[in-house]
Amino acid sequence: MIIYVIIAFVAILIGMAISVSAFGTGGKRKKIFQDIYFSVEDVDGIGVLYTKTGEYSAILKMENPVQKYSANIDSYYEFNHLVTALAQTLGEGYAIHKQDVFVRKQFHDESNDNHEFLSESYFKYFNGRSYTDSKTYLIITQENKKSRIFSFDSKKWRDFVVKIRKVKDQLKDSGVEASYLDGNTAREYVDRYFSMNFNDKVVSMTNFKVDEESICMGNKRCKVYSLVDVDCVSTPSIVRPFTNIEVNNVSMPVDMVSLVDSIPSADVVVYNQMFFIPNQKRELSLLDKKKNRHASMPNPSNQIAVEDIKKVQDVIARENKQLVYAHFNLVVGVPIDADIQKCTNHLENSFGRLGIHISKRAYNQLELFVNSFPGNCYSTNPEYDRFLTLSDAAACLMYKERIQHSEETPLKIYYTDRQGVPVAIDISGKEGKNKITDNSNFFCLGPSGSGKSFHMNSVVRQMWEQNTDVVMVDTGNSYEGLCEYVGGKYISYTDEHPITMNPFAIKREELNIEKIGFLKNLVMLIWKGTQGEVTKTEDRLIEQVITEYFDEYFMKKQIENLSFNTFYEYSKVRIPQIIKENNLAG
């Protein structure tokens, strides 16, 4: 009996050993998130992430430079040039990891202002409407090539600090708004990525579960889609940074991967775009060896490979292009009860139309998710997660567009964007953060029935609510009701009561060279007409009369009031005197 018990006990132990050997104890998976970061520290206001594998990283929050639906083809190419320039600046041993985050939100008026009735009704109409918001982060990571991660290299650290500052300056010079996250903000961003929660003020993580198809966390389910299957790369032979869509039978350029911001059922989407910059000489040498290996075994497929490698080598030699290893993936989050297969079908169909067939073998869901943490991109497997390409070709697969946000301006005029939610625009061009002009006058022109009055009534009402003085000139009495509503002054021209003006009625502080010049030109126009010629003597004469006229009023108090009539009476007396005093002829 004792022998049977011993045999049974040994069998259980052997079974447990086999189970642990095959499947692990669960501890490794449980601690996988604890093994990413060593610390996050502030260095001169920049939050630097230190991974346990010895990499340094800094996170830039930026705005993509291409306005969505701007139809500006040049701006897409300019972004490509910018990305390749950043890669050239960083050089060997660095990685560029760009994360574009798209979040479904419900619109709520957050201005906390006491609106007038019409504005209150306006915002109430849009309250709760769904829209997609986007944010962009650029993570610069320095690779640690040594096995001993605790050996500090001051030279590499200085190089990292210099390079990240160069990147920010380069973005700024290209007109891209960018700023580094500090330590606390960087920690918060990492936590938000971990929980895939970029919406709530407070984030938490509950009930984390992973299988081959998806990752469940709390009340949402996420799936990671790898864009390129390294074992069977299926991408177009020629790519460009934009694609065309048809709008009213007219082609319009949009981002090549613009589909990532409109995935059905998705509450949150993170598009990870990673560039790894290798040693160029070594990669060219490996390419040459690969070409020779294919050439040594003559068959059609090897011959095609040889020709492709030759083309790449020619482009690199002729145009000084840079080789990079790239990885792209999408982390798509949906409600726990939603069918994530709809997202899969949408992505497969949409990318298929672009000639890109996304990987169907992304069974390493947890690995892809963890490797996409900010600063952890070097954990991606070089064998099956990265593919070699040219930097400008890889940049074509980056997301380049920005969704319209409200401008930072004290004068907010609200319009609805293409998603149907209000955004604040500074139409004056001079009050906002980005100054465009110092002249806020504008002209509204359109055919009858095109909506001029409807538009301008809305604009003027919003300006009035923000204590802005508005002077309007209009034909048709379209704004009489608005003027009465806000208690304005309405001046209307009729034959019986024409509009009059008194340009001479000014205050002492308003009298300057510009004002005298204006009045001189006005007098000359009345005197000579539009086609008349004015001599230098006449010009000086009228200028002197105007100057003395105002001196008589402001200084000597000899004129009762300022008007064209009193100026005319003064001129009739004074002009002959000046002519006589200076012996002027003509």
What are these regions (language model features)?
Residues 2-401:
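Extended, folded cores of ATP/NTP-driven motor/assembly subunits in large transport
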Residues 77, 161, 324, 341, ...:
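Conserved structured core elements
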Residues 57-59, 93-95, 135-137, 327-329, ...:
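Beta-sheet entry/capping signal
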